[in-house]
Design a protein with these regions (language model features):
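A short, Lys/Arg-rich alpha-helix, primarily the initiator
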Residues: 1-34
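Short, charged recognition helix plus adjacent turn
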Residues: 1-8, 75-94
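Residues that mark the N-terminal boundary/hinge immediately upstream of a DNA-recognition element
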Residues: 27-28, 59, 70
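Recognition helix of helix-turn-helix/homeodomain-like DNA-binding domains
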Residues: 37-55
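Short, basic-rich loop-to-helix N-cap that marks the start of a DNA-contacting helix
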Residues: 49-65, 81
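Hydrophobic/aromatic-rich, well-ordered segments within soluble, folded domains that form packed cores
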Residues: 69-71, 75
Length: 94
């Protein structure tokens, strides 16, 4: 059983995946799971049940290293999930 803080990290992980999908950086969870050899069934189960003990910390590192997701945001919820994306949108605004 995951702690409440661990479940929050898991929820932010899935939120980051949704942002990446919405911004067309990834096509979806299948793209992510195939790239890193993650069992898609486990990922789908975890999304529905964040308290399950199947989350792998390496999944966070993939988001941080390969997609620029904020490690601080993933772990604490503070700041922006994708600061580079926020900065890009702000600079494009008139």
């Amino acid at each position: 059983m995951q702690t409440e803080d661990s479940q929050k990290v898991v929820r932010r992980f899935f939120e980051a995946l949704q942002v990446l999908k919405r911004e067309r950086i990834i096509r979806g969870k299948q793209t992510f799971t195939a790239r890193y050899g993650i069992n898609r069934w486990n990922l789908n189960t975890l999304e529905k049940e964040p308290s399950r003990d199947i989350f792998q910390p390496a999944w966070l590192s993939y988001l941080v290293k390969d997609y620029g997701v904020s490690a601080t945001w993933l772990l604490t919820g503070q700041g922006e999930p994708l600061k580079w994306l926020t900065d890009k949108k702000e600079s494009a605004s008139p």
